[in-house]
Amino acid sequence: QVASDEGTYTLTSEVWFDATIEQVFEVYKYWEYATKFSSAIVEARDLEPDEFGRAQFYIRNRGCVLFFCQSFERQGYVESESNVVLRAFANPETSDFYHCNESWQFSVQNGGTVVTYDLSMRPKFWIPPAIGPYLLKRKLKKNGGQAVDRIELIAQAIDHE
């Protein structure tokens, strides 16, 4: 579900993976995995912790919607509780967003893992207001489905015993 309100976009999704919670959490925990499951992410890496000891991340995305192509960066910090929740907060001084906050909630269900994703972002770049939400939703659905399959395969290959 994608919504917009005066330039701020929100998204909520829920996905079930045929993998353990430990395996799935590990895929999300390390930002380097992102380039393996999302074609929109062209660079991703974990950075050294900040002065408060918080894990840091950097991601560069590239995407096109119709004829409009954009490359954008996010850099910020992560808060996490192992196998329960990850929260990422982009720093507006080093990102192409006024704000971009994400959270992933992990739970065991039906012999697998459910991940509930919430995003709130206000980009510094232009998204066409009349059709932006529709195009963003379409793009996320298309790329998201492919990413889900890849995440599951990566998670299943992680050995957690």
Language-model-derived ranges and their functions:
Residues 2, 56-64, 87-93:
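Short beta-strand segments that buttress and anchor functional surface loops
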Residues 17-21, 61-65, 78-82, 94-96, ...:
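Beta-strand elements of well-folded, non-transmembrane domains
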